[in-house]
């Protein structure tokens, strides 16, 4: 397949390299304006990819979108007029709501979501480390996307295991619950994920997930608070030494994805008349931090 990766950060670069190794024609669309970008995965041989090449966009069978949620609209909208209407759009990012916000622009395209537990890190612009093996689920956002289940096989051949999940919203909400519990707390307290096992965090994690569960159920997504809590603590223990993406964003004073994580739950709660005081307070704390940097 002809594949373009929009936003080759750590995860996007990981997939670009594995899809290239699986025999696909892969190009990048990065903020960097140079015509080629070289990436190296761990100790493997470096690979050069075409970058910001309009011809690769016009002939793309698949556009893999791995920018951060708050970057989706600005990064994708200028590219849409150059895409064939049969080009599959596959979104792989933290949080929810970014695709909904631009859904009217996407009605003619097959649209897919993916969620992955692979860990990746870019120490430099060109060096990619695969820091943790995981699994990936792919599923449809719209009816055209529902016809594209073969993409799971394409990705599975590149970096297994990958499964097709026709109920991808369930998986996205479960990951959102994990992010709602871990990201704002680790960002505010500037701690590693593992610190959240401390007893003083138990009440707030419980309250966060109770609110998320209520909103999920109003959205007709099945979920039990206890099961979500078990999932959160599994992730905390499995990633104990890790610094969450929001922790890093706050540390480096970068925009966070709070609007598409905690903010998404708060907005959906408002739509359904469900109070989310704990998530709302965390949302405001992160937004206040972001605003303080812009004034500094």
From Swiss-Prot:
The record's Gene Ontology cellular component field reads:
cytoplasm
- Write out the residues that bind substrate: 94, 179, 183, 193, 245
* Biological processes, Gene Ontology terms: pantothenate biosynthetic process
> Where does it mainly reside?
cytoplasm
Alphabetical list of Gene3D superfamilies matching this protein: N-(1-d-carboxylethyl)-l-norvaline Dehydrogenase, domain 2, NAD(P)-binding Rossmann-like Domain
E.C. code: 1.1.1.169
Q: Cite the annotated pathway.
A: Cofactor biosynthesis; (R)-pantothenate biosynthesis; (R)-pantoate from 3-methyl-2-oxobutanoate: step 2/2
Annotated protein name in UniProt: 2-dehydropantoate 2-reductase
InterPro entries under this entry? 6-PGluconate_DH-like_C_sf, 6PGD_dom2, ApbA, Ketopantoate_reductase, KPA_reductase, KPR_N, NAD(P)-bd_dom_sf
Q: Which Pfam families match?
A: ApbA (PF02558), ApbA_C (PF08546)
User: Which residues are the active-site ones?
Assistant: 175
> Which source organism does the UniProt entry give?
Vibrio cholerae serotype O1 (strain ATCC 39315 / El Tor Inaba N16961)
Described function: Catalyzes the NADPH-dependent reduction of ketopantoate into pantoic acid.
